[in-house]
Amino acid sequence: HLLDTRRRRAAFADLDGDGDLDMLTTNKIDPEDNATSRMFYFENTGTKTHPVFHQRSHIPLFENYHYAPTLGDLDGDGDLDMLVGTWNKGIGFFRNQGTRSKPNFVLDENGWITLTRGSNSAPTLQDIDHDGDLDLFVGESSGELNFYRNVGTTKNPSFELVSDRFADIDVGRRSFPTFADINADGKYELFIGSETGKILMYREENSKEEVSFKHDPAFSLSLNNYATPSLVDINADGKLDVISGSISGGLIFYYGR
């Protein structure tokens, strides 16, 4: 099934509790309703090693454009909550009022996260300071990166802006960040998609006092324009795969070897 995602990211997680990865994906502007974007839930009806995605429903959100979802347990109750980036409204926080296998995402009106610069927010969650709670990184239209440290707890997150030009990162236009530990050393690699389709990689060089990343020029990967990468092991073969939206529509899968 080819979906007009155009520039938006897919998010992967086990959303029905059956042990394989399901998918949320969005479009830039919904062709059936030009007043908003739309988010779709695709269930993996295949297996962990041979995924087959079928569209089951769309997830109702607020009206805006350029939805960009990311998932994580933000309130410590064992199920997945959701942050959704937008064109011009910042980032919405959706608490899962359902369960791990039957999620019900409800907007927390007091949980909005606003940007100090840029638009087209593209959030991703990672415990980057290794303190047990999820921190927030946000790509945006200028091509730079916003870092919000979680100064709350695993049950009550509170995101405090550390820098809206984190590590002087600038990919040109339309930064889309995601994390992975590609060499299993306990440190994260930061991958950032861009408007040109080039994906840059930065390696974690944290100290006890500071979160820090350094660009690795040896890594090179170019996709279609407006790359929105996610790195997951989609077929459970122990190797990370890259899934990206693009300006031409649809999702592009690159399997790790």
Language-model regions, residue ranges each:
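Short loop/turn segments that connect beta-strands within the blades of beta-propeller domains
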Residues: 6, 35-37, 86-87, 140-141, ...
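Glycine-aliphatic tripeptides that mark coil-to-beta-strand junctions in extracellular
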Residues: 19-25, 78-80, 132-134, 186-188, ...
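Hydrophobic beta-strand segments that make up the repeating blades of beta-propeller
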Residues: 23-27, 82-86, 136-140, 190-194, ...
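Beta-propeller blade termini
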Residues: 8-17, 26, 67-76, 121-130, ...
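Blade-level signature of beta-propeller repeat domains, shared across WD40, Kelch, NHL, RCC1
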Residues: 227-257
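Short glycine/acidic-enriched loop and turn motifs that connect beta-strands
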Residues: 28-32, 89-90, 143-144, 197-198, ...
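Loop/turn-rich, solvent-exposed surfaces of beta-rich toroidal or solenoidal domains
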Residues: 178-179, 188, 192-199
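Blade-edge motifs of beta-propeller repeat domains
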Residues: 1-5, 43-64, 95-118, 149-172, ...
